Structures are given as structure tokens and as C-alpha cells.
Amino acid sequence: MDRTSSRCKVAIIGSGNIGTDLMIKVLRHGRHLEMGAMVGIDPASDGLARAKRLGVATTAQGVEGLLALPEFKDIGIAFDATSAGAHARHNELLQAHGVKVIDLTPAAIGPYVVPAINLDAELDAPNINMVTCGGQATIPMVAAVSRVAQVHYAEIVASIASKSAGPGTRANIDEFTETTSKAIEVIGGARKGKAIIVLNPAEPPLIMRDSVFVLSEVVDRDAIAASVKEMVASVQRYVPGYRLKQEVQFELIEKPANVPGVGLVSGLKTSIFLEVEGAAHYLPAYAGNLDIMTSAALSCAERLAERGKVRTLPSALV
């Protein structure tokens, strides 16, 4: 693996599914990144146990424990993979020490970032929000349509395996819908957005599936299809398991429909169906929702370190 001569040490706050998957990605694939600490609140968590076995500094005392670790002085980036409710305090403590924060909760204190859309535009922000797993999967498709047509309304449905949703994800369900809906508008380009999440209890667990429905002005359908395929390729650069389930579908809506928050609109309905297969770094391949979130966060951190937006340590010191 190609590793650069200087790397940024990172801390991961949250030793659940997302935090553990992210830790494994940093350890296996980090080019500009080095694991500095894994932080949790449950001493018996699998994530903390794995971190210890892999030689990563750990604490079960939350952010306060992280601040007390001797390794903290070298941390340049902290990933928060806890909950929206806890993030505000975590962010305040970390910002006070000059640590760049990548927020994997729906708290959305900082600007929304989806790497395929707006990564480079937000590198100077002290806190970057990764929206949600459903947002990372679907908002690129809304943006793909909005760059060739005015989007009146966009609705997404994210279906994930219940087994892939840990306590943190379940605690964030309400924030998931609110944050994803808003991000569909802010970076997806829709006048109005709506998000729905489904925790699928099927056994064996099913791969992450996402449906995206967009109502836009009438434009050339080939232009939309080409834009969608180009965007899929952009996401695949950091999430190889991201793909179209079938060809993009179109339907002309001639009779105006009343869209709450928008009013009466007609136009072209574009339906996009996706699936996201995980890399199986921690949970099996059905957990594409973990993989797209952690891969997006890793992509952001790598770019921050590469562009010198965070403190790094020379290779002799790491």
C-alpha cells in the first residue's frame, strides 16, 4: 500500500458498527491517515476490544477520556460516530483543542458534504457533516438530475438490513429523515426534499437498496441518464459496491400535482434504483449503509490531510 511520508493521526468516537468499520478502513487503507485512538463508553464493546488487539489506544470514558490520553496531543481529525444528541458537546470540546471534526451523525452542525458533489468546497470548515447513509447513497442522484434540469421535488427511500443498524443508528431515526430531507435541497438542488428510511428485518439480511424519485422540468432524457451514470462512476471511486440496479426510468407528468411546500407542478419524473454492497470490513456485504458512510468519511479525511488542512506528523514520529 502506498503510504505518504507524513500522516494525520485520527480519533474515532463511537465504538459501534460505524466506528469499528471506519477504524478497520483507516488501518487497512489509510494513505494520509494513522489511527490515534478509539473512543467508546462501553468497556465491553467489540469495537474497543478489536482496537486494543490491533494496538490502537483506547478509552471507555468518552470524549473526556480521549482528552486525557497522551495520544490526544497528536490528533488532527476526530470522527464522531455516536449520536446527534451527543455531537454538539463533543464538537465543542474538540474545537477548543483545534481538532478538525468529521461528523457521522445527523447533527449537521457543520456543512453537509457528499464527496462526489462538494468535498473540495468545504475543506476549510472546522466541522464537516456526512449527512446520513441514505443521503450519501441518494443525494448524488438528485444532484445528477439537478445539474441538467430544475428539480421541483425529490423523494428518497433507503432500505437497510435491520441487522446493520446498531443502537446509534436507531436512536437517530428522526434526525435521519430531517437531515437527509434538508440535504436533498441544500446540496442535491431540489426545491423540496423528502427522505424515508426502512429497517428491513428480512432473514437472511438484504443488501442496502435505495429508490430515488425526482420531479423536474422536462429536459432531454438522455442528458439525465448520462448525468446519472457519470455520477455513479464518481461515487464508485470511493464506494466500489455502489451501482444502478436497473436503467433509469422516466415518466411524463402532464397533469399538475400538488407538492407540499412547492405547489402545483408538472414535468418529468425520473426514477433511479440503486444498491450498495459493502466491502465487508466489519459487518458482511449486506451492510452497504455502513460502507458508504465510512468510505465517504474516509475520503473526506484523506483529502483534508492531503491538502494540509490538519496537523500531520512526519513519518519518523508515527
From Swiss-Prot:
Entries under Pfam families matching the protein: AcetDehyd-dimer, Semialdhyde_dh
Keywords linked to the UniProt accession: Aromatic hydrocarbons catabolism, NAD, Oxidoreductase
SMART domains named in the record: Semialdhyde_dh
Biological process, per Gene Ontology: catabolic process
Residues that, per the record, bind NAD(+): S15, G16, N17, I18, S164, A165, G166, P167, G168, T169, R170, A171, N172, N289
Active site: C133 (acyl-thioester intermediate)
InterPro entries assigned: Acetaldehyde_dehydrogenase (IPR003361), Acetylaldehyde_DH_C (IPR015426), NAD(P)-bd_dom_sf (IPR036291), Semialdehyde_DH_NAD-bd (IPR000534)
The keyword Oxidoreductase appears for this protein: yes
Catalysed transformations (reactions): acetaldehyde + NAD(+) + CoA = acetyl-CoA + NADH + H(+)
EC number: 1.2.1.10
Catalytic class of the enzyme: oxidoreductase
Keyword Oxidoreductase assigned: yes
GO-annotated molecular function: acetaldehyde dehydrogenase (acetylating) activity; NAD binding
Family: Belongs to the acetaldehyde dehydrogenase family.
Descriptive protein name: Acetaldehyde dehydrogenase 1
Gene responsible for this protein: xylQ
